[in-house]
Regions:
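Aromatic-lined ligand-binding clefts that engage carbohydrates, nucleic acids, or primary amines
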Residues: 746, 865-895, 901-902, 922-926
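Carbohydrate-binding surfaces of carbohydrate-active enzymes
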Residues: 49, 67-68, 81, 99, ...
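An acidic-aromatic loop/edge-strand motif
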Residues: 135-137, 142, 157-160, 172-175, ...
Length: 985
């Protein structure tokens, strides 16, 4: 460091300290202000912490009236903003077509777009937009020159010992585009035939993406039969690379080839590249076209200048960078691509060697041996991922930043395209992922939750917002049960690091499309046309409160997990727990790009932004790159703790034979030459350990768990996330079961008063029950089914102080059951009877009256009852509805006093100040979803059709017709009880 730099840093530090007052500790003052800010914004969150949405403009079919109605509805629910997403998808999976509106980017479409910006500005909402119609970048403007490319070849066998003059056949060509790369020859004698081909070759070459979401891709590093094998009778050769001959100069531009061929049998390969068959997916009508070449910066520049720049120019300075803040592209769902014009040069620059002699692999031949071939293929895929990151996502960010805008592409899966997700995320301004609600299409958690990789990138790169396309499903439609489906999924992903929901979907639907109107074929529909919109505020407010604290917090983790340097590389959901952290510790995920920048301070592993971890955990597949191994040697030497199995081989051909020798030397240096199943080796100031989990390792180093539920070590019953906000510790604790749970929650905090912050209500109270011991605080919590609570530690107390109460939440005793008859009023405008008496509470779908059986909307339950117990003014009394279907949302009024809306189990409201001695009148409004009414209309159960939509409920999620539409249980099912709160003992 130069003397000039030292002086400048001293001046800067002096200036910073001079900005603080000397009369009191500036940290105390800042801390007090921030804490008050947290409390006020928790109770009534600012709009900036609100939810956002994928605002679908399906087939371009929107109107100014519908735009205004939607934006005003968003404002009424305190939305932060909306992401305009022009797309098709309305007619997928057996659903019906809708009219076509203006084409994306056309003059008419852009006029509607600018109108939406004007309205959003008027309402104080932020707008983003997806820069194409459909899922992946491309469209009718993308000519073959700029389209995605793939390798292609032709091959023929010849006999040498003479001069050959041949017309080499053109390889398969798509979309009229082809360019040659190289012509190669290699011996093809029976002696070098092999029966051991490279497995999963099309996947390893990037011709296809892996199926499913967040699959384990590590099998691509080795030779095994997992994945999708293509059966072939083709003869496969094992080729000595030294005998492969580059004959490119022997072929003219017309494919005429001449060669004085040596004796023996030879294979001649003409290798080039053409367009892939990929087309833009799920676009509006007339936006079909080629997928863009994601590896070519010129292709992105062309698309930007042709499509995006004119839209921004139309939006103008009054919107761009202010109302119009972010741009998006959707997740990779465009198949494979494995070549671009400059690929050979880029490969040489990135990997350090020439790739051409390895290209017989595309025909299935083995070059040198299986290990060498697989190592080359790993380098090949890493180069694809590198080019996608630097020539597509980095280029996207550069263009956006020139307009004072940010980007938020879903650039890391969960589909396993040729991506390094963590590297891509480094170019994002908002880190985006997705998660799904439970449904027949995706019932398993590992198929629905993908936030961990995105949140790790945000933590490491210092990005504030971790967003997600949220609550995606593929059918059935409108039958969401908020407490069971949406809240459980939201809380699960909050614990993985989510801090902003983007509702998928919020569809713009013109009035002429009726009610519930046009909808996307997938997603949880949230918009002003759903039956329960008028009661949606508490559900959305809950998410706002949770997001506020999550966005303000700094994540706490002890473990950094390196998930390998292979491509594709998509980390699965948090509970896959590859480092072995759970339950009790948390972790971040990192890739090679970040690992190469790690440092060590006081034994902690430090990322460039300053975040610290206690241990670095390696993947268990025993394959690493030489650069990573060199970096590990440096980290351990300086004092880092590294945990993982001894590597067996290098993932790459980088460094050649010299590199392979260095790799073995470093492995033996770090792990030792002879090791058992478990053990530890000291090197320099640090240690390398193996054979134990990260949790076991940290406990062995006397690092206490960050969070625990005493007596329950389940990884699935409970979850948590820990943030620090200034000097406050903020824990979000989630019950991930359908049962009420009483737990003793143990936190790695002491000397601070625990507070309970209830995101359902905004209530903040000090915990009266807690114990401090061994630098930990144990707080009794009662969590309702899929319930949650923030536990906040802020105010200093004596470390020996203990809470005075036995519990922090009451139990509830039933005093009276409101059984017997209820009068129920349905809305005749939606086909229901104006008034009917239920002798007892019943599921509407079991009623003999079809007007009730197929009803959708709000029904008003009325009941008069006489209190049969003596009220005690010291008690709190509650009305518990217990079971509300199908959305699970209701409002309660007693004796004319509104007691609010309930949407979570057990649907309990405080009626203390409304309940009176003698006769009482209770009114319960219950709202179900559109599902049953749409089903009834589809089956023509009534001469009157009440609904209009493109969605067909008579198909399953695959689009296949079902024999019968099963209706969704609906209504107030009870039992309805009056309960009294009693102190826990």
């Amino acid at each position: 460091m130069s003397w000039k730099t030292i002086c400048w840093e001293a001046i800067l530090l002096g200036f910073l300290f001079s900005c603080t007052g000397s009369d009191k500790d500036p940290m105390d003052r800042k801390y007090q202000i921030d804490y008050d800010y947290l409390k006020s914004n928790f109770q009534q969150p600012d709009r900036t912490y609100g939810v956002n949405c994928w605002w679908w403009w399906l087939n371009g079919n929107v109107t100014k009236e519908a735009i205004t109605k939607d934006l005003e509805a968003m404002k009424s629910r305190n939305f932060q903003g909306a992401m305009i997403f022009d797309a098709g998808g309305h007619n997928q999976r057996g659903n019906k077509d809708i009219p076509a509106g203006p084409l994306f980017g056309s003059e008419e479409w852009t006029e509607l777009f600018v109108f939406a910006l004007d309205e959003a500005k008027r309402l104080g909402l932020e707008i983003g937009f997806n820069i194409q119609s459909g899922w992946n970048l491309g469209g009718p403007c993308v000519t073959p020159q700029y389209a995605a490319k793939q390798l292609t070849y032709s091959e023929r066998k010849v006999t040498g010992g003479k001069t050959l003059r041949l017309q080499l056949a053109e390889p398969d060509i798509y979309k009229g585009f082809y360019k040659d790369i190289v012509v190669l020859a290699f011996p093809s004698n029976k002696e070098n035939k092999t029966n051991e081909p490279v497995s999963n070759l099309d996947l390893k070459l990037g011709f296809h993406e892996l199926g499913g979401s967040a699959p384990d891709c590590r099998f691509l590093l080795e030779n095994n039969t997992r994945g999708r094998e293509k059966k072939t009778d083709k003869t496969i050769y094992l080729i000595d690379i030294a005998r492969i001959v580059d004959l490119t100069t022997q072929m003219d531009e017309k494919g005429l080839f001449s060669w004085d061929a040596p004796e023996g049998d030879w294979n001649i390969m003409r290798i080039g590249y053409t367009c892939t068959r990929s087309e833009v997916s799920t676009s509006s009508r007339d936006w079909q076209g080629n997928v863009l070449d994601y590896m070519d910066r010129n292709a992105f520049d062309y698309y930007w200048n042709t499509i995006v720049e004119p839209i921004l120019q139309a939006a103008g300075e009054k919107h761009v960078g202010s109302t119009l803040k972010f741009m998006e592209t959707d997740s990779w769902e465009c198949g494979g691509m494995n070549w671009t014009d400059a690929f050979a040069d880029e490969f040489r620059s990135y990997c350090g060697y020439d790739l051409k002699l390895y290209l017989p692999l595309i025909a299935g031949h083995v070059v040198d041996n299986i290990d060498t071939s697989n190592a080359f293929l790993a380098d090949f895929r890493k180069t694809i991922a590198h080019l996608v990151a630097t020539n597509h996502y980095a280029c996207f960010a550069e263009h956006a930043h020139q307009h004072n805008m940010g980007i938020q592409p879903e650039s890391a899966g969960p589909h396993a395209g040729p991506l390094d997700g963590m590297k891509n995320y480094g170019f994002s301004d908002i880190v985006m992922s997705e998660f799904w609600s439970p449904s027949p299409h995706r019932p398993r958690p590992q198929d629905r939750f993908f936030i961990k990789q995105a949140s790790s990138a945000a933590h490491i790169y210092g990005k504030k917002i971790v967003g997600a396309e949220s609550f995606t499903t593929i059918g059935p439609h409108w039958n969401d049960e908020l407490w069971h489906d949406q809240k459980s999924a939201f809380d699960h992903e909050i614990c993985a690091g989510l801090n902003r929901v983007y509702f998928h979907t919020f569809t713009c639907s013109p009035a002429e499309q009726g009610i519930p109107g046009q909808e996307y074929f997938a997603g949880t529909h949230v918009n002003p046309r759903v039956t329960w919109w008028s009661k949606s505020a508490p559900f959305i407010d809950y998410m706002h409160r949770v997001q506020m604290l999550a966005q303000e917090g700094t994540f706490v983790a002890d473990i950094l997990y390196y998930y390998g340097d292979h491509v594709p590389n998509v980390y699965p959901f948090k509970h896959s727990d590859m480092p072995g952290a759970m339950f009790g510790f948390d972790y971040d995920v990192t890739d090679e790009n970040i690992l190469m920048k790690l440092g060590v301070k006081d034994g902690d592993i430090v990322v460039p932004g300053g975040r610290k971890y206690k241990v670095l955990v390696l993947p268990d597949h025993r394959i690493l790159s030489l650069p990573v191994l060199k970096k590990l040697e440096m980290l351990v030497k300086e004092g880092a703790s590294v945990l993982g199995p001894k590597p067996q081989k290098a993932v790459s051909l980088f460094g050649g034979e010299k590199g392979a020798a260095e790799f073995k030397k470093l492995v033996d240096l770090l792990w030792g030459t002879t090791i058992g199943t478990t053990g530890q080796n000291q090197y320099g100031k640090g240690f390398v350990s193996w054979g134990i989990t990260a949790k076991e390792y940290l406990l062995s180093r006397n690092q206490p768990v960050d969070f625990a539920v005493e007596g329950n070590d389940s990884k699935t019953d409970f979850d948590y996330i820990h943030y620090v906000i200034d000097d406050a510790h903020v824990y979000f604790v989630s019950n991930q079961t359908t049962e009420r749970q009483k737990i003793d929650a143990c936190f790695r905090v002491s000397g601070l008063q625990p507070e309970l912050w209830n995101a359902l209500t905004g209530e903040i109270r000090e915990a009266g029950a807690f114990t401090q011991k061994d630098e930990k605080t144990v707080v009794p919590l009662t969590l309702e089914p899929y319930g949650s609570m923030f536990v906040v530690f802020h105010k200093k107390i004596d470390r020996n102080k203990q809470g005075a109460k036995a519990g922090n939440d009451p139990d509830y005793e039933i005093l009276q059951t409101l059984d017997g008859a209820w009068t129920v009023n349905f809305d005749p405008e939606w086909g229901g009877p104006s008034s009917v008496v239920f002798p007892e509470l019943i599921d509407w779908t079991r009623h003999s009256d079809k007007r009730i059986k197929y009803f959708s909307g709000t029904a008003v339950y009325n009941k008069k009852f006489t209190v049969n117990f003596e009220k005690n003014p010291a008690n709190r009394y509650y009305l518990q509805l217990e079971n509300v279907k199908d959305v699970g949302i209701a409002s309660v009024c007693i004796n004319g006093k509104d007691k609010g809306i309930v949407w979570t189990k057990p649907f309990r409201v405080d009626i203390t100040d409304g309940l009176k001695e003698g006769e009482n009148d209770v009114v319960v409004e219950v709202t179900n979803s559109w599902f049953n009414r749409v089903a009834g209309d589809e089956m023509a159960v009534s001469p009157t059709k009440y609904t209009q939509t493109n969605i067909v409920l008579g198909n399953d999620f695959r689009g296949n017709a079902v024999s019968e539409i099963t209706l969704e249980p609906s209504g107030l099912l009870g039992p309805v009880t009056i309960q009294v709160a009693v102190e826990q003992k």
